[in-house]
């Protein structure tokens, strides 16, 4: 079992550090090199791999400096996106061996067209596709693509730990409660999130099991969720409900 640590960056990013038992590690989506280098030095760790989910600068901005500090590091990322530092270009179905664990690459377009995720060891690193109680904005893809990406994630085991790249949970929960004000799981989660954030403790990782109970973007077949967007849709199929939710969240 790999050990995962969060390295905060910018206002609300999480850079995930994946560590094995002999001081070797990888990082996921290092938008800023400085906090990573400080953590590596303080803990006497050697960086062996960088995993990238998509090309936005708050996810890749620190890669060049990390490569300079660790010239032999592998840089793994999406084949379909313009990331010049890649040494290993990956796409749906590819496999990655990381400290004795096999990670599968998932194609997760929507937020960006080439966005990928990494799933293995009971963990999903999903960048900006799925957040706790929310999902990413659709910048390059279509609502249909994002819906399919989330549907793909939904098929993973429910105990899968979800490591997304931002601490957006409190604002996401506020929206989720506007969608489902009577959801008791959400009300309890709001209290849990407020307590954790009051102590400056991350709300991430979450689990897929929890998200299926509280995340409106994964609940497009739920009657209360459908009812909440009735005045925004002509058809109540799950993708139309999801699309209406995403448009509502954009203006929330």
From Swiss-Prot:
Pathways per UniProt: Secondary metabolite metabolism; methylglyoxal degradation; (R)-lactate from methylglyoxal: step 2/2
Biological process according to GO: methylglyoxal catabolic process to D-lactate via S-lactoyl-glutathione
Short name of any one Pfam family annotated for the protein: Lactamase_B
Keyword tags: Hydrolase, Metal-binding, Zinc
Positions bound to Zn(2+) 1: 54, 56, 111, 128
Function summary: Thiolesterase that catalyzes the hydrolysis of S-D-lactoyl-glutathione to form glutathione and D-lactic acid.
Annotated family: Belongs to the metallo-beta-lactamase superfamily. Glyoxalase II family.
Name under which the protein is recorded: Hydroxyacylglutathione hydrolase
Native species: Vibrio campbellii (strain ATCC BAA-1116)
Gene it is expressed from: gloB
